[in-house]
C-alpha cells in the first residue's frame, strides 16, 4: 500500500514538472501540447502517469465490484496477467507498423477488461463453495456482468464498423478478442444462474452438473470456431498470429476435455443405474452410513460401487459429471464395471491308457548312434546358447586325397595306415572344435590334439574354474545363523546371498559338464553299426590264445586300416591283395552290405595274410642261429 502511494506521488510530481516546464517554454496551450507530444522524455513520463491512472481506476473498480479479493483470486489474476502481457508484446511485433499511442491505449484497455472478466469468473465459481450469499454479492456480480457485456458488445461493434469502412487493420485483433470475452461473459452468466437456482432450492439440484457440463461444451465449441476463423483470416490478410497460439491451444484442450467428460459421465451414470445395486439396510448398518460427498446420513436412495463403497445416487451422479472414480478409493468405476469374461473350461479328455511296466524308453529324435543327446531347451534358463557337438562322419563319403606315395611292402603299408588314421583323427578334432564361444567376439584356438598314448583325453579348452562352495551350516557361527533367520532387510539379504552362491555352483557345474561332453564328442566320433560289428568280431578273433601281444597290436592297426580302406570310395587295393579278397569285394559291391559270414571269412584271410611274413622271419632267424 505504501509502495503504491509512493509510486503514485512520484509519477504525479514528474508529470506536473514536465507540464510546467513545457508551459514555461511555450506560454500557450497549443504550443505546449505540441511540445509534449514531440518530446520523447515528456511522452515517457506521460505514459507512466497513464499507467498509474489505469492502476488506480482498477483498484477503485475492484473495491466497488469485488470488495476484498481472496488469495486464490489474486494468484490467478497475477498468473494470467503475465501471459496476457507476453501475448500483448508479441502482438506489438506483429503490428509494429501500426504502433502508436492509440494502439498502446487499446491494448491496455483490453488487458484491463480481461482482468475483470477473470475476476468475475472466479467469483461466480466461489458461489458453489460459499454457504452464505448476500444480496450485495448478487448486485455486484450482476452489475459487473452487465457492464462487461455492454463494453464487449460496443467494442465488437466498433471493430466491425472499422473493418467494413477502412479494411483489415489492427481492429481485426480487437474484434476477435472482445468476441471471445463475450463468450466468457455468457458462460459466467449461465453458471451464475445455475448456482442461484441451486441455492434457492432446499435439496441439492441433481441436474445442475449436467447443465454446467453442456454449457462448457457449448461455449468451448464457440471459442474454437472463433479462434479458427481468426487464424484463417489473419494468415490470409496479414501474417501468422503468433500471439494467438497459446489461447487457441487452451481453448481446444478445454473443448476436448468437455467432450470427454460428457461421454464418460454418461457412460458412468448409465452403469450406475444398470449395474450398481442399491444399498440394503444391512449394508448401511455394516458400514458408516454417512455419504462423504454431501456429509449427510444415507437412509434411502444409496448405491453400492464395485469397491463396496456406498454413496447417495444424486451425489454420485453429480460426482460422475467431473470424474469417473470412486470418491473414497479412487478406483476407476468404468474399468471395474466391465464384465469379466472368463474362458470356458476345456472339455474333459479321455484318460490315456497306462504305459506297460517294461515299456522301452523311446530314443531321442535326431541323435546319431553313440552320441549323447543335448539338453532340452529351457532346462537352464540363465544359460546362453552353446555350440553343439559335430555331426558324425557319414560312412562311404569320399575321403580327401593325399599326396603320400603308396609303399609296396606290407610293413610300410601298416605304418602309413596307422599314421594316416592318426592324422585324420587330429584333423577331424581340429575342424570340429568350436571356433568361438557364445558371448566372445574373438575366435577360440582349437583344442589339443588327441594322442593314442594318453590314457585320458586332454581337458576341454577354456574350462571355467569352479567357484568356491558356500560355507556349511554346521561351520557357521551362531551370529551368522541368527542373521539368516532374522526378519528384515539384513536377513533377507543373507538368505538371498546363500541362494545366489548355490545358483552359481549349479551353473558352473552344468557349464563344465557341457564343456566335457562337447570335448568327448569331438575327440571320439561315433561309428556306424557295421564298423561296430566288425570291431566286436575282430576282438573275438584277437582274443585267441595262439596270438602274441605284438601280433595283436599289428592286427589292430591292420584292421583299422582295412576298415578305413573298405569304407572309402574310389580306393584301389595294393598288389599284396589276394584274388579271393578281390572276388569278395566285387560280390560286396554287387550285393550291397556283406553278411556276417562274409565278414568273418574276410577277417580270417586278413589274419592269415598278416601272419605269413612273421612266420617266415622267424624261420630265417632260427636257421641263422
UniProtKB/Swiss-Prot annotation:
Query: Transmembrane stretches, by residue range?
Result: 5-25, 41-61, 99-119, 136-156, 170-190, 213-235
Q: State the name under which the record lists this protein.
A: E3 ubiquitin-protein ligase synoviolin
Recall the taxonomic lineage recorded for the source organism: Eukaryota, Metazoa, Chordata, Craniata, Vertebrata
List, alphabetically, the PROSITE patterns matched: ZF_RING_2 (PS50089)
What EC numbers are recorded for this enzyme?
2.3.2.27
Here the segments flagged for biased composition (Polar residues) are 523-564
| Topology with respect to the bilayer | Multi-pass membrane protein
For side Cytoplasmic, which residue ranges? Answer: 1-4, 62-98, 157-169, 236-625
Quickly give the catalysed reaction: S-ubiquitinyl-[E2 ubiquitin-conjugating enzyme]-L-cysteine + [acceptor protein]-L-lysine = [E2 ubiquitin-conjugating enzyme]-L-cysteine + N(6)-ubiquitinyl-[acceptor protein]-L-lysine
The role this protein plays is: E3 ubiquitin-protein ligase which accepts ubiquitin specifically from endoplasmic reticulum-associated UBC7 E2 ligase and transfers it to substrates, promoting their degradation. Component of the endoplasmic reticulum quality control (ERQC) system also called ER-associated degradation (ERAD) involved in ubiquitin-dependent degradation of misfolded endoplasmic reticulum proteins. Also promotes the degradation of normal but naturally short-lived proteins. Protects cells from ER stress-induced apoptosis.
User: Where is Zn(2+) 2 annotated to bind?
Assistant: 307, 309, 326, 329
Q: Where is this region: Interaction with p53/TP53?
A: 236-270
Q: Which segments does the record annotate as RING-type zinc fingers? A: 291-330
Q: Which residues bind Zn(2+) 1?
A: 291, 294, 312, 315
Its source organism is Danio rerio
Amino acid at each position: 500500500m505504501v509502495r503504491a502511494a509512493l509510486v503514485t506521488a512520484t509519477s504525479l510530481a514528474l508529470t506536473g514538472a514536465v507540464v510546467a516546464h513545457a508551459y514555461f517554454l511555450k506560454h500557450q496551450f497549443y504550443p505546449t501540447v505540441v511540445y509534449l507530444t514531440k518530446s520523447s522524455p515528456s511522452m515517457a513520463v506521460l505514459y507512466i502517469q497513464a499507467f498509474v491512472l489505469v492502476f488506480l481506476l482498477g483498484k477503485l473498480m475492484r473495491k466497488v465490484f469485488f470488495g476484498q479479493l481472496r488469495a486464490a483470486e489474486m494468484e490467478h489474476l497475477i498468473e494470467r496477467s503475465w501471459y496476457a502481457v507476453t501475448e500483448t508484446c508479441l502482438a506489438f511485433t506483429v503490428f509494429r507498423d501500426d504502433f502508436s499511442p492509440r494502439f498502446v491505449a487499446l491494448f491496455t484497455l483490453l488487458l484491463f477488461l480481461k482482468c475483470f472478466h477473470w475476476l468475475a469468473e472466479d467469483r461466480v465459481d466461489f458461489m458453489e463453495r460459499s454457504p452464505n450469499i448476500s444480496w450485495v454479492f448478487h448486485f455486484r456480480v450482476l452489475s459487473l456482468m452487465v457492464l462487461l457485456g455492454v463494453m464487449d458488445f460496443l467494442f465488437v461493434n466498433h471493430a466491425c464498423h472499422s473493418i467494413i469502412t477502412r479494411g483489415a487493420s489492427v481492429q481485426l485483433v480487437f474484434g476477435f478478442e472482445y468476441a471471445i470475452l463475450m463468450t466468457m461473459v455468457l458462460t459466467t452468466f449461465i453458471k451464475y444462474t445455475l448456482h442461484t437456482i441451486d441455492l434457492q432450492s432446499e435439496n441439492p439440484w441433481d441436474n445442475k452438473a449436467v447443465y454446467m457440463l453442456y454449457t462448457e461444451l457449448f461455449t468451448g465449441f464457440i471459442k474454437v470456431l472463433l479462434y479458427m476463423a481468426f487464424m484463417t483470416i489473419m494468415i490470409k490478410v496479414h501474417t501468422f498470429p503468433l500471439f494467438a497460439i497459446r489461447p487457441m491451444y487452451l481453448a481446444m484442450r478445454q473443448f476436448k476435455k468437455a467432450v470427454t467428460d460428457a461421454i464418460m459421465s454418461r457412460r458412468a451414470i448409465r452403469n450406475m443405474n444398470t449395474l450398481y445395486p442399491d444399498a440394503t439396510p444391512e449394508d448401511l448398518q455394516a458400514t458408516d452410513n454417512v455419504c462423504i460427498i454431501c456429509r449427510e446420513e444415507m437412509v434411502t436412495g444409496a448405491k453400492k460401487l464395485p469397491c463396496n463403497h456406498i454413496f447417495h445416487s444424486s451425489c454420485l451422479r453429480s460426482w460422475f459429471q467431473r470424474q469417473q472414480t470412486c470418491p473414497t478409493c479412487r478406483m476407476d468405476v468404468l474399468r471395474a464395471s466391465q464384465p469379466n469374461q472368463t474362458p470356458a473350461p476345456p472339455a474333459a479328455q479321455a484318460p490315456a491308457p497306462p504305459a506297460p511296466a517294461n515299456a522301452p524308453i523311446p530314443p531321442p529324435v535326431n541323435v546319431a548312434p553313440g552320441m549323447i543327446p543335448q539338453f532340452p531347451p529351457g532346462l537352464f534358463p540363465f544359460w546362453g546358447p552353446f555350440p553343439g557337438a559335430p555331426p558324425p562322419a557319414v560312412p562311404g563319403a569320399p575321403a580327401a586325397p593325399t599326396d603320400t606315395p603308396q609303399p609296396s611292402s606290407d610293413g610300410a603299408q601298416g605304418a602309413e595306415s596307422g599314421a594316416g588314421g592318426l592324422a585324420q583323427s587330429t584333423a577331424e578334432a581340429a575342424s570340429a572344435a568350436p571356433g568361438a564361444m557364445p558371448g566372445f567376439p574373438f575366435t577360440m584356438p582349437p583344442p589339443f590334439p588327441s594322442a593314442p598314448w594318453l590314457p585320458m583325453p586332454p581337458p576341454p579348452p577354456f574350462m571355467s574354474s569352479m567357484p568356491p562352495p558356500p560355507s556349511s551350516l554346521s561351520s557357521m557361527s551362531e551370529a551368522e545363523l541368527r542373521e539368516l533367520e532374522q526378519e528384515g532387510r539384513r536377513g533377507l539379504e543373507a538368505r538371498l546371498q546363500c541362494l545366489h552362491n548355490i545358483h552359481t555352483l549349479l551353473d558352473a557345474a552344468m557349464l563344465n559338464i557341457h564343456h566335457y561332453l562337447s570335448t568327448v564328442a569331438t575327440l571320439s566320433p561315433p561309428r556306424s553299426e557295421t564298423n561296430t560289428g566288425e570291431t566286436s568280431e575282430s576282438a573275438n578273433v584277437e582274443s585267441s590264445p595262439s596270438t602274441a601281444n605284438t601280433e595283436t597290436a599289428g592286427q589292430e592297426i591292420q584292421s583299422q586300416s582295412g576298415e578305413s580302406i573298405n569304407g572309402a570310395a574310389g580306393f584301389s587295393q595294393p598288389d599284396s591283395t589276394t584274388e579271393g579278397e578281390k572276388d569278395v569285394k566285387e560280390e560286396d559291391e554287387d550285393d550291397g552290405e556283406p553278411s556276417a559270414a562274409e565278414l568273418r571269412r574276410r577277417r580270417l584271410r586278413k589274419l592269415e595274410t598278416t601272419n605269413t611274413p612273421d612266420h617266415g622271419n622267424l624261420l630265417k632267424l632260427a636257421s641263422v642261429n
